Swiss-Prot record:
UniProt-annotated location(s): Cell membrane
GO cellular component annotations of the record: non-motile cilium; plasma membrane
Family per record: Belongs to the G-protein coupled receptor 1 family.
Extracellular compartment spans: 1-54, 112-128, 191-221, 295-308
Lipid-substituted positions (S-palmitoyl cysteine): 346
Domain of life: Eukaryota
Any GO molecular function: peptide YY receptor activity
One biological process term in Gene Ontology: outflow tract morphogenesis
The protein's name in its UniProt record: Neuropeptide Y receptor type 2
Keywords, sorted A to Z: Cell membrane, Disulfide bond, G-protein coupled receptor, Glycoprotein, Lipoprotein, Membrane, Palmitate, Phosphoprotein, Receptor, Transducer, Transmembrane, Transmembrane helix
Length: 385
């Protein structure tokens, strides 16, 4: 639950709304609560309204968006462009990049605007769409990381060299999106775009969760706890178990020859890279999930003076996972590092930079050489990749 969503909760009394309002919307100067009605537009009190804090938030969100769009687009580009990169594991990594791109382009810009303005001014459609899209992308990322871990566990621990076919991998990706869409759907359905009158003559537009049920049965809390288990705790338990067994297997492995040593070393590096991806995902999302859970269980957390700032900082940390993955690919995986470099090189250097794609380029050079033997044939300059 976001800081402004709490004000729009259906089960809150006017007194509770006023109490929460005094935490978030009191004027910066000292004004008695009884006189708030005299000021038609009281200012936000929390630190997120300070200019210097807003500049930092703008820089943080824009940096995440820029790095995420560039990095994830590059991952998708090299997997599509180079045939040697079209492996099952890389298809799953590309799916991870697509999910992160969804967050970078559709969620973060609107979240930043919502945070800076202090109320939802983006209309009812985006009110339902943005939270749903973010939840969808996070679910897809978690499912994809789990599938990658299980696939590598199957191949390395049990020596099953018959890999998952590309057709099956696409089917798994489709199922991942379908299941994720179903799990995230309550955030689009049980949502309300409303105008809330906090005090007389002062209203704000709120995009808040609106769950059915009354009394002690809080469906919002039930959903939050369920998603924490399904989206975070259970996948991380499965992934940790899989990579622990993989690590143990590789550590105790004895290679009979130099060729197998090289193959074993490559597997180790790839596994290390994927473990780092999972660790970054787990660590970056842990503060946000924990804070969300505590907020849903204990409403007194909403009374914290800097609740909105804490929520925003944890959200920024969580969103860092959307650009961290491409950095890990480029840093820890030779294939990706080579492909990234190739994307910025000219074709005449392709064969020296990326041997896997050199055959087609060499064939083209031979054809151009034959043409250049005939008078009148002009030399064709190679184009950029």
């Amino acid at each position: 639950m976001g800081p402004l969503e709490a004000i729009g909760e259906e089960n809150q009394t006017d007194e509770m709304k006023m109490e929460l309002f005094t935490k978030l919307y009191l004027p910066r100067y000292t004004t008695p609560v009884s006189e708030l009605a005299l000021d038609p537009k009281p200012e936000l009190k929390d630190s997120t309204t300070l200019v210097e804090v807003q500049i930092i938030l703008i820089f943080a969100y824009c940096s995440i968006i820029l790095l995420g769009v560039i990095g994830n687009s590059l991952v998708i580009h090299v997997i599509i462009k180079f045939k040697s990169m079209r492996t099952v594991t890389n298809f799953f990594i590309a799916n991870l990049a697509v999910a992160d791109l969804l967050v970078n382009t559709l969620c973060l810009p609107f979240t930043l605007v919502y945070t800076l303005l202090g109320e939802w001014k983006l209309g009812p459609v985006l009110c339902h769409l943005v939270p749903y899209a973010q939840a969808l992308a996070v679910h897809v990322s978690t499912v994809t990381l789990t599938v990658i871990a299980l696939d590598r566990h199957r191949c390395i621990v049990y020596h099953l060299e018959s890999k998952i076919s590309k057709r099956i991998s696409f089917l798994i990706i489709g199922v991942a999106w379908a299941v994720s869409a179903l799990l995230a759907s309550p955030l689009a359905i049980f949502r309300e775009y409303s105008l809330i009158e906090i005090i007389p003559d002062f209203k704000i537009v709120v995009c808040s969760e609106k769950w059915p049920g009354e009394g002690q049965l809080n469906y919002g809390t039930i959903y939050s706890v369920s998603m924490l288990l399904i989206q975070y705790v259970l996948p991380l338990a499965i992934i940790s178990y899989a990579y622990t067994r993989i690590w143990t297997k590789l550590k105790n492995h004895v290679s009979p020859g130099a060729g197998n040593d090289h193959y074993h070393h490559r597997r180790q590096k790839t596994t290390k890279m994927l473990v780092c991806v999972v660790v970054v995902f787990a660590v970056s999302w842990l503060p946000f999930h924990a804070f969300q859970l505590v907020s849903d269980i204990d409403s007194q957390v909403l009374d914290l003076k800097e609740y909105k700032l804490i929520y925003t900082v944890f959200h920024v940390i969580a969103m860092c996972s959307t650009f961290a993955n491409p950095l890990l690919y480029g840093w820890m995986n030779n294939n990706y590092r080579t492909a990234f470099l190739t994307a910025f090189q000219c074709e005449q250097r392709l064969d020296s930079i990326h041997p896997e794609v050199s055959a087609a380029f060499k064939a083209r050079k031979k054809l151009e050489a034959k043409k250049s033997q005939f008078p009148g044939d002009s030399f064709t300059q190679p184009t950029n990749v």
